[in-house]
Amino acid sequence: MYGAEVDGGNDSDMEFSNVDCPFMVKVDIDDLNIRKGAGTNTAKTGRYTGKGVFTIIQVKSGSGSTLGWGKLKSGAGWISLDYCVRIN
């Protein structure tokens, strides 16, 4: 299952899953916080993703995100999948 599909828009009934890892997501906002852990209760790294395509290697549930948190392949940290669209 995916959190969202490119041609179908967001579907809040669907979830991202570790079974699908790794997968790519598109971020369309400039200031998506990168966090040190999976949740808004973890510290921000002080960096933002910017708009672009990113590879997610792990998914975890956590506070502040309905669809879960994705760990960036780059090692920069975790992003909320609520602001991502799966592209593959």
Where are the regions a protein language model picked out?
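SH3/SH3-like beta-barrel superfamily modules
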Residues: 1-5, 45-87
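SH3-family beta-barrel domains
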Residues: 5-33, 46-50, 65, 85-88
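Residue-level detector of functional hotspots within protein domains
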Residues: 18-20, 40, 58
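Eukaryotic modular interaction domains in large regulatory/scaffold proteins
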Residues: 34-37, 53-54
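Short alpha-helix capping/helix-loop boundary micro-motifs
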Residues: 38-44
